[in-house]
UniProtKB/Swiss-Prot annotation:
EC number: 2.1.1.195
Gene Ontology MF terms in the entry: cobalt-precorrin-5B C1-methyltransferase activity
GO biological process: anaerobic cobalamin biosynthetic process; methylation
Pfam families: CbiD
UniProt entry keywords in alphabetical sequence: Cobalamin biosynthesis, Methyltransferase, S-adenosyl-L-methionine, Transferase
PANTHER family: COBALT-PRECORRIN-5B C(1)-METHYLTRANSFERASE
Cited Gene3D superfamilies: CbiD-like
Catalytic activity: Co-precorrin-5B + S-adenosyl-L-methionine = Co-precorrin-6A + S-adenosyl-L-homocysteine
Protein name: Cobalt-precorrin-5B C(1)-methyltransferase
Superkingdom of the organism of origin: Bacteria
Annotated NCBIfam families: cbiD, PRK00075.1-1
Highest classification ranks of the organism: Bacteria, Pseudomonadati, Pseudomonadota, Gammaproteobacteria, Methylococcales
Length: 381
């Protein structure tokens, strides 16, 4: 039997595991017994069966644990016990109230898109947890509401090995995941897939490649560039260097990069591998850009003292400087990449917010043929 290549097995996010635990505990309230396994719908629509441990029901509460399997890209949360305690709320019929418990971080600063003082459970996992709980609860929600408490025993210790403290998240880890799937981004297998995808585009006669950092940015640029065939779009993940080195080797003439503020800042500051755990975002750079586009000195100081790229974006939006800020950031990205890859390809940067809404686009002044108001160059299909 042919073995599966090492480094290709995907895993599941803390958000997906939390949703599965919450669903299992909710089923425990409905049926009187927590199941040993549960089928859970991920944010990407995929349905996956998770093993459930330590399931129990005690009166109007139920408890379930899903142990995280990060696949072939184990991070610090691999094997963490994502735990859900679900309790009836007789006075809140139809409500699903989500809370953070032991080992889930608390937000202490603005800039993460989450309420200060609330749990570090990101928006997509929040919606996914609630959707799974509602689906499992069924008619139960016609008689009562449900309180869902997500906890991670040992999460405070795990968080010490993350960048949460720099982001103002204290007391535990974050519950994350936009698709529910952990891809092995740090493996040779994923790097090889990025290289291969660019080679395929070149071999099919394309002279444009559109590089994105993930699923949301890829959907964004696909909507912006509907004239391009799917082969032109490549999710490079964190592997900018491998992607652009392959572009040069294959002789592709045009590169479009789609991204959000965090990854783009890392590219602008010269990072070639943009994984969150490698180096922090340079907020001094963001403060300089904010000053460049006219932000007051006190705002620039706040940005400089923050640890989050998103905070800078939010402050610029409040000031009505969001477009100018992103255009300046895009120019910094082009300048940095041009120093590393002089005259090898044209560059255009497309930028979106965290909901994949377009914020700005910039291109090199010497590449008018790549303006997005007109069709991009396209090779033979």
């Amino acid at each position: 039997m042919e073995k599966k290549p090492k480094g290709t097995r995907t895993g599941y996010t803390t958000g997906a595991c939390s949703a599965a635990a919450a669903r299992a505990a909710t089923l425990g309230l409905v049926r009187g017994r927590v199941p040993d396994q549960v089928e859970c719908e991920l944010p990407n629509g995929q349905r996956v069966v998770f093993a459930v441990t330590d399931g129990r029901c005690e009166g109007a509460t139920a408890h379930a644990v899903v142990i995280k399997d990060a696949g072939d890209d184990p991070d610090v949360t691999d094997k963490a016990r994502l735990t859900a305690d679900v309790a009836l709320l007789p006075e809140a019929v139809g409500a699903v109230v989500l809370k953070g418990g032991e080992g889930v971080g608390t937000i202490t600063r603005q800039g993460l898109g989450l309420e200060v003082g609330g749990p570090a459970i990101n928006p997509v996992p929040r919606r996914n947890i609630e959707a799974n709980v509602r689906e499992a609860a069924g008619d139960l929600l016609e008689r009562a509401g449900l309180e869902v408490v997500i906890s991670v025993p040992g999460g405070e210790e795990i968080a010490k090995r993350t960048l949460n403290y720099r982001l103002g998240i204290v007391g535990g880890i974050s519950i994350l995941g936009t698709t529910g799937i952990v891809h092995p981004y740090s493996t040779a297998a994923f790097r090889a897939s990025v290289i291969q995808a660019i080679e395929v585009a070149a071999n099919q006669g394309q002279d444009v490649v559109v590089l994105t950092t993930g699923g949301r940015t890829e959907r964004f640029v696909m909507n912006e560039l509907p004239q391009l065939p799917p082969v032109c779009f490549v999710q490079m993940g964190d592997f900018l260097k491998y992607a652009l080195d392959t572009v040069v080797r294959c002789g592709l003439r045009h590169v479009v990069i789609g991204g959000m503020v965090g990854k783009l800042t890392k590219i602008a500051q010269g990072e070639t591998i943009t994984h969150a755990n490698r180096n922090a975002v340079d907020t001094d750079l963001l403060a300089d850009i904010a000053a460049e586009v006219g932000a007051p000195a006190e705002v620039c100081a706040d940005i400089r003292n923050s640890a989050m790229a998103r905070y800078a974006s939010e402050r610029m939006e409040d000031l009505g400087l969001i477009t100018a800020f992103y255009e300046a950031l895009g120019r910094r990205v082009i300048r940095t990449l041009r120093e590393r890859y002089p005259d090898r390809f044209t560059l255009r940067i497309l930028m979106c917010d965290f909901e994949a809404n377009k914020l700005a686009e910039v291109a090199e002044e010497d590449s008018p043929g790549l303006r997005l108001s007109s069709p991009l160059p396209r090779g033979e299909d």
